[in-house]
């Protein structure tokens, strides 16, 4: 996993990966948001919903701990060794929105991550053990949790949506958009 030496470096990497990820949705029509393609595990809407789910959970964990609540990770009723149901809850919660709305919501959530990073001290961000919700057997510092819920999936899921787009040629996507 990538190491970061400053808040600025982390925020710049999130922004770079997010912008590339988000741009992939420019040529996907609303009529195709739920279109399944063989060999790609998520529809465009599910792809965005997954990102929205994890980024918002990350922000929720922090907000709850700061407010004095005991945080149950990954989410109440879900376990780390069985995340399929959690993913389905993301698809249900965010899949009701259009691609445009999902993209806007993700942009808002990513902006909240930037603001949050700015509020953290270097110790809170880069030293393990500063947040109960981040204190697992792995003893990761908060920045690693931010990385695995932003940079890593923006990178990996960009590849998945690119594959989806290769299997649904642009001419077909444009033609369907006009209909």
Swiss-Prot record:
UniProt keyword annotation of Transmembrane helix present: no
Gene3D superfamilies named among the record's database cross-references: dinb family like domain (1.20.120.450)
Pfam families: DUF1706
Location of this chain's protein in the cell: Cytoplasm; Nucleus
Keywords recorded for this protein, A-Z: Cytoplasm, Nucleus
Keyword Nucleus part of the UniProt annotation: yes
A biological process from GO: replication-born double-strand break repair via sister chromatid exchange
InterPro entries: DinB/YfiT-like, DUF1706
One GO cellular component, as annotated: nucleus
PANTHER family given in the database record: CLBS_DFSB FAMILY FOUR-HELIX BUNDLE PROTEIN, PTHR40658
Record's miscellaneous remark: Present with 172 molecules/cell in log phase SD medium.
Protein name: Uncharacterized protein IRC4
Gene that encodes it: IRC4
């Amino acid at each position: 996993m990538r190491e970061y030496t400053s808040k600025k470096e982390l925020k710049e990497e999130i922004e770079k990966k997010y912008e590339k990820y988000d741009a992939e949705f420019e040529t996907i029509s609303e009529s195709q948001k739920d279109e399944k393609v063989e060999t790609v595990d998520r529809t465009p809407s599910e792809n965005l919903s997954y990102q929205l789910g994890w980024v918002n959970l990350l922000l929720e964990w922090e907000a709850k701990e700061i407010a004095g609540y005991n945080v149950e990770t990954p989410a109440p009723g879900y376990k780390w060794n069985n995340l399929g149901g959690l993913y389905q809850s993301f698809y249900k919660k965010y899949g009701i929105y259009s691609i445009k709305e999902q993209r806007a919501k993700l942009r808002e959530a990513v902006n909240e991550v930037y603001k949050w990073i700015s509020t953290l001290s270097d110790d809170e961000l880069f030293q393990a053990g500063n947040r109960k919700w981040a204190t697992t057997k792995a003893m990761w510092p908060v920045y690693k949790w931010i990385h695995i819920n932003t940079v890593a999936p923006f990178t990996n899921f960009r590849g998945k949506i690119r594959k989806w787009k290769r299997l649904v040629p642009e001419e077909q996507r444009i033609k369907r958009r006009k209909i």
